């Protein structure tokens, strides 16, 4: 499982949705999305949407994944956060870096 954490964290840096990490784990175990969803007691649609990158990892799902894989909920939520940050950087990064910072802020004189 430590290999899962290391490999997943490295891949997260490359704009990979956490569902891809989950898909890889399920493939290695030979487990279908339907069987996995039964194991963690969630609707199959939730798992398939995560696997397709169409649904985010929520707190509830992170707890279930952590329990099943012997990781932490924070691990799964961090993968989701890293993914979302990478997407935001791609979409708005340049505009955000052009904004003032506390060091460059000049109060308006009234």
Would you name each region that the model predicts?
Residues 1-9, 104-110:
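Intrinsically disordered, low-complexity and often Lys/Arg-enriched segments
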Residues 31-49:
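Short alpha-helical DNA-recognition segment
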Residues 43, 54, 69, 80-83:
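The DNA-recognition helices of helix-turn-helix-type DNA-binding domains
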């Amino acid at each position: 499982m430590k290999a899962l954490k290391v490999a997943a964290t490295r891949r997260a840096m490359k704009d990979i949705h956490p569902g891809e990490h989950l898909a890889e784990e399920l493939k290695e175990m030979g487990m279908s999305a339907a069987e996995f969803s039964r194991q963690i007691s969630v609707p199959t649609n939730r798992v398939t949407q995560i696997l397709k990158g169409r649904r985010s990892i929520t707190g509830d799902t992170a707890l279930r994944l952590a329990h099943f894989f012997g990781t932490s909920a924070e691990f799964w939520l961090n993968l989701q956060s890293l993914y979302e940050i990478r997407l935001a950087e791609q979409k708005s990064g340049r505009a955000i870096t052009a904004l003032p910072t506390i060091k460059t802020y000049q109060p308006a004189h009234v």
